[in-house]
Design a protein with these regions (language model features):
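Conserved Walker A/P-loop ATP-binding site and its immediately adjacent core
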Residues: 33-38, 53-76, 301-304
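Conserved pre-motif I regulatory segment
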Residues: 1-28
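Walker A/P-loop
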Residues: 20-44
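A short beta-strand element within the Helicase C-terminal
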Residues: 132, 347-351, 355-373, 378-385, ...
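SF2 helicase catalytic motif II
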Residues: 111-113, 125-170, 175-177
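Interdomain helical connector at the RecA1-RecA2 junction of SF1/SF2 helicase-like NTPases
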Residues: 3, 181-294
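A conserved SF2-helicase RecA2
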Residues: 219-228, 377-380, 388-425
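Conserved helicase ATPase core of P-loop NTP-dependent helicases/translocases
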Residues: 96-99, 297, 307-308, 318-355
């Protein structure tokens, strides 16, 4: 069953899709609040009553982890509500599309794999241009990226030519790319016709007379124990300790104050990452977390820093996991499974940014950010790893440890609502 705020989004979105063929919209919900489950219920309703159990669904994501999570959610919903035996088609990695009959199928595809397949096989492109009911894009804030944008427009245009325009549904906790006015932000809003649906806080407050009224989505869900509340515990390191020049400090400040995706100079990042005093303080805190059995996801400054911290943990007989972009998928899954196992001694997962999306572990007790973060998207994704509350299998409170560089960003409420003013609400 859906919770009231999920049901309300489902009701509003289905009503919107029924008003016009080929309607497009984006669902904006916090990480851990059930975006995927809500989308699956929407698919079930539309497939049964609007698509007459015909045609097929296309679910797109950028990573294998996201696709596997989506399949698990679909199976759970379909087991209880499905009107017919839908066929699951996997299209990523070693999985290929073989059956030409797509009627009654839901295709879970990586964007890279689907695009490569459609380029080399004209017949596949013709097949997918017939009977496509709805395209769902998980983590859709990435949709403006050139290749993804081209793929979506190609699918929408081809189906338009064939006479039936599919609906387009985006899912994200961060409905923007950079600072709101960037070209990619504009492309994102245009792709979804500037339509964004989220949690109706005013309506939900009326459903909860026993609670004091919440001012925003995050506060509402925290009061309901759906999201966890953060206990902030910063590590304060002075500029003198980092031994940065005035020019380097100014570079960081300008990057942190920028509305866009301005990055801190890589040489400065390396200098920060190699600072012995800084790393000593970080490791002392990690030792303490591990000794207390606190499940921690650690975001390093760069790849070299991640390897250094992981090696130091290992040398001190701490069972940590290291996950980088180059990590083999089988080894990555093994480490993630070990981390998720509460009986395992693996309490710390070290990465740079790989685990910002496609990683779902309700048992995270601590998010540790050691790098200067200049992107509101990246920052939101990082803190989102630990935001799942007790009603969603997580914790009532989550520790958030940041180095002082990241404190220029506001709290989780500010981060979630950052892009609202750029959309037609």
């Amino acid at each position: 069953e859906l919770l009231d705020y999920q049901y309300d989004i489902r009701r509003r979105l289905i009503s919107f899709y029924r008003e016009q063929q080929g309607a497009r919209s984006l669902i904006h919900m916090p990480t851990g609040s059930g975006k995927t489950k809500t989308a699956m219920h929407i698919i079930q309703e539309l497939w049964a009553f609007d698509y007459n159990n015909k045609g097929f669904i296309l679910w797109l994501a950028h990573s294998e982890e996201l696709l596997r999570q989506a399949i698990d959610s679909f199976k759970s919903v379909w087991r209880n509500l499905g009107a017919f035996p839908a066929n699951i088609v996997k299209l990523w990695g070693e999985f290929d599309w073989e059956d030409e009959n797509l009627d009654g199928c839901i295709i879970f595809a990586s964007i890279q794999k689907l695009q490569a397949m459609l380029k080399r096989n004209q017949k596949s492109l013709e097949l997918i241009s017939q009977g496509l009911n709805i395209i769902v894009v998980d983590e859709c804030h990435k949709a403006p990226a050139t290749k993804t944008h081209e793929l979506l427009l190609d699918l929408l245009i081809r189906n338009n030519i064939s006479g039936k325009i599919p609906n387009l549904l985006g899912l994200t906790a961060t409905p923007g790319r950079k600072g709101g006015y960037d070209v990619e932000d504009i492309k994102l809003r245009m792709l979804f016709d500037n339509v964004k649906l989220g949690i109706d806080v005013e309506l939900m407050n009326k459903y909860e007379p026993g609670y004091s009224s919440a001012e925003n989505e995050i506060e509402l869900l925290q009061k309901r124990k759906i999201l966890s509340a953060f206990d902030r515990d910063p590590i304060k390191i002075s500029a003198e300790t980092l031994n940065l020049s005035p020019v380097e400090i100014n570079n960081i400040k300008k990057s942190l104050q920028s509305d866009g995706e301005r990055k801190v100079n890589a040489e400065i990042i390396s200098k920060i990452a190699n600072n012995k005093t800084r790393n000593k303080l970080i490791l002392e805190r990690l030792f303490e977390l591990n000794n207390n059995g606190i499940k921690t996801i650690f975001f390093a400054c760069n790849v070299a820093h991640a390897k250094l911290i992981n090696a130091a943990l290992r040398l001190n007989n701490i069972d940590s996991g290291l996950i980088l972009g180059e990590t083999a998928s089988t080894f990555r899954r093994k480490q993630i499974d070990g981390f998720k196992d509460d009986s395992s001694s693996l309490n710390i997962l070290v990465n740079v940014s790989v685990l910002t999306t496609g990683f779902d572990s309700p048992n995270i007790d601590c998010v540790f950010i050691s790098r200067p973060v200049t992107s509101i998207i990246l920052y939101s994704q990082m803190i989102g790893r630990g935001i799942r509350g007790p009603r969603m299998g997580g914790n009532e409170r989550c520790k958030l440890i940041e180095v002082v560089d990241n404190l220029d960003f506001g709290d989780e409420c500010w981060a979630f609502n950052f892009f609202d003013s750029y959309w037609s609400l």
